[in-house]
């Protein structure tokens, strides 16, 4: 038995200068797990609640002392003495103790930090790397794959202080044979994009996720700049590198008139018109994945978009599904989208996260493991991506240590598996729904 002997919570700082929750779980034998909760900027309305103090005299109201107190008191008292290797039991104890549908009593930030720290401590007690332990929890022990990165190299929307409406323009180094090669390709395109933007007199300041945040005349301009950067780096767009977008459509959807209002371009679209706007972009550029291409509440619009684009484009639900199996189940039944974005803190525990990944895979949907715009040095999502063989990861651009921490952990994992004589496959374009 890997007995929990101590649980510690503390307030630390994330990549946006806001507080977040970090937890330590200590076991008999001296094993310790340490984990921190991330935080989103564009959030789905049905996400589990991130508990903030609301005290304007401290961190502008964004302190997390209440969530930390829950870790140090109620949660600690409930799980000390329990077996850390019973992950589902530990998570359920916290969920039941919280007693709310959206974890608003303790906060998903408190529960998640403890959930992940517990898994890390349990893995250490078994002498396993975290990715291997996650595979065991997932019922897929020994089954790994390296994820295809979706690298956000131009930031807009809520992730940047610019006029670009679409939140993320991403590259996928699909021509790579290994994760390490994919990162090299991504880095080379990133640096060439800086040169392209500078040559046009544009800003090379970066947004929350490490991508550039220039003011551009249109979303098509962003894609054109990336195309030029890919070619300058010596790669072929559509063969070596493909494109992906996160529209974060809920951020520019006007619920009063039902229109998608792209103020950066001075255009407004109905739901169906916006789908056809995106369809035109996919004809001009090799865009193989579109995330949140409609507002989270516009299920009719999503159904239409899936009908129009779903046979050839991966349509990822983020704000749409919020890593929630109840919502995902409904989406699967109604034929909404064909992929889910997986964010730990949208649901608030490792066990529930694994359940969402399994449900998606069982239904033929893909699962894209994702960071949040507010991150820390915690690299757990790298282990999650490998340990569930999810196939894809979204963890930012080729700058900012909070993003690079995840890529570096993936490098370590890939190397460790190679040294052990059990290399994990890198799936390339096959990982993307509709591209196999």
Swiss-Prot record:
Its cofactor is Mg(2+). It is an enzyme of class 4 (lyase). GO terms for cellular component: cell surface; extracellular region; phosphopyruvate hydratase complex. Keywords: Cytoplasm, Glycolysis, Lyase, Magnesium, Metal-binding, Secreted. It is found in: Cytoplasm; Secreted; Cell surface. Binds a second Mg(2+) ion via substrate during catalysis. GO terms for biological process: glycolytic process. Pathway: Carbohydrate degradation; glycolysis; pyruvate from D-glyceraldehyde 3-phosphate: step 4/5. Its EC number is 4.2.1.11. InterPro entries: Enolase, Enolase-like_C_sf, Enolase-like_N, Enolase_C, Enolase_CS, Enolase_N. It catalyses: (2R)-2-phosphoglycerate = phosphoenolpyruvate + H2O. One of its GO terms (molecular function) is phosphopyruvate hydratase activity. Its main location: cytoplasm. The active site is at residues 209, 343. The keyword Aminoacyl-tRNA synthetase does not apply. SUPFAM superfamilies: Enolase C-terminal domain-like (SSF51604), Enolase N-terminal domain-like (SSF54826). Pfam families: Enolase_C, Enolase_N. Disulfide bonds: none annotated. (2R)-2-phosphoglycerate binds at residues 167, 343, 372-373, 394. Belongs to the enolase family. Component of the RNA degradosome, a multiprotein complex involved in RNA processing and mRNA degradation. Catalyzes the reversible conversion of 2-phosphoglycerate (2-PG) into phosphoenolpyruvate (PEP). It is essential for the degradation of carbohydrates via glycolysis. This is Enolase. It comes from Haemophilus influenzae (strain 86-028NP).
């Amino acid at each position: 038995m890997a007995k929990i002997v101590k649980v510690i919570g503390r307030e630390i700082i994330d990549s946006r200068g806001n507080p977040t929750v970090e937890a330590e779980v200590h076991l008999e034998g001296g094993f310790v797990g340490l984990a921190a909760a991330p935080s989103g900027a564009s959030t789905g309305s049905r996400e589990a609640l991130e508990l903030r103090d609301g005290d304007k005299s401290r961190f502008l109201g964004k302190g997390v002392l209440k969530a930390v107190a829950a870790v140090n008191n109620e949660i600690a008292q409930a799980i000390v003495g329990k077996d850390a290797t019973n992950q589902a039991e530990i998570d359920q104890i916290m969920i039941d103790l919280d007693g709310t549908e959206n974890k608003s009593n303790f906060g998903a930030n408190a529960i998640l930090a403890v959930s992940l720290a517990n898994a890390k401590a349990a893995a250490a007690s078994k002498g396993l790397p975290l990715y291997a332990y996650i595979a065991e929890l997932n019922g897929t022990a020994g089954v790994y794959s390296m994820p295809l990165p979706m690298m956000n190299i131009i930031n807009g929307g809520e992730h940047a202080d610019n006029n670009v409406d679409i939140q993320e323009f991403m590259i996928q180094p699909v021509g790579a044979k290994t994760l390490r090669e994919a990162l090299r390709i991504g880095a080379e395109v990133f640096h060439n994009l800086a040169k392209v933007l500078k040559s046009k007199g544009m800003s090379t300041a970066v947004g929350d996720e490490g991508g550039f945040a220039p003011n551009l005349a249109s979303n098509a301009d962003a894609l054109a700049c990336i195309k030029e950067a890919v070619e300058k780096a010596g790669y072929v767009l559509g063969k070596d590198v493909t494109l992906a977008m996160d529209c974060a459509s809920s951020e520019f959807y006007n619920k009063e008139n039902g229109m998608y209002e792209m103020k950066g371009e001075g255009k407004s679209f109905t739901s169906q018109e916006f789908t056809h706007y995106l369809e035109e972009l996919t004809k001009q550029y090799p865009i193989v994945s579109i995330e949140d291409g409609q507002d989270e509440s516009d299920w009719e619009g999503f159904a239409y978009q899936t009908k129009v684009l779903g046979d050839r484009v991966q349509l990822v639900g983020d704000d749409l599904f919020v890593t929630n199996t109840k919502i995902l189940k409904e989406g699967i039944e109604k034929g909404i989208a064909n992929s889910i974005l997986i964010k730990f803190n949208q649901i608030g525990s490792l066990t529930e996260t694994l359940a969402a990944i399994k449900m998606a895979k069982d239904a033929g949907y893909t699962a894209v493991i994702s960071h949040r715009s507010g991150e820390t040095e915690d690299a757990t999502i790298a282990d999650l991506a490998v340990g569930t063989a999810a196939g894809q990861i979204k963890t930012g651009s080729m700058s900012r240590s909070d993003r690079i921490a995840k890529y570096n952990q993936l490098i370590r994992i890939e190397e460790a598996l190679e040294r052990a004589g059990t290399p994990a496959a890198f799936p390339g374009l096959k990982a993307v729904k509709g591209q196999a």
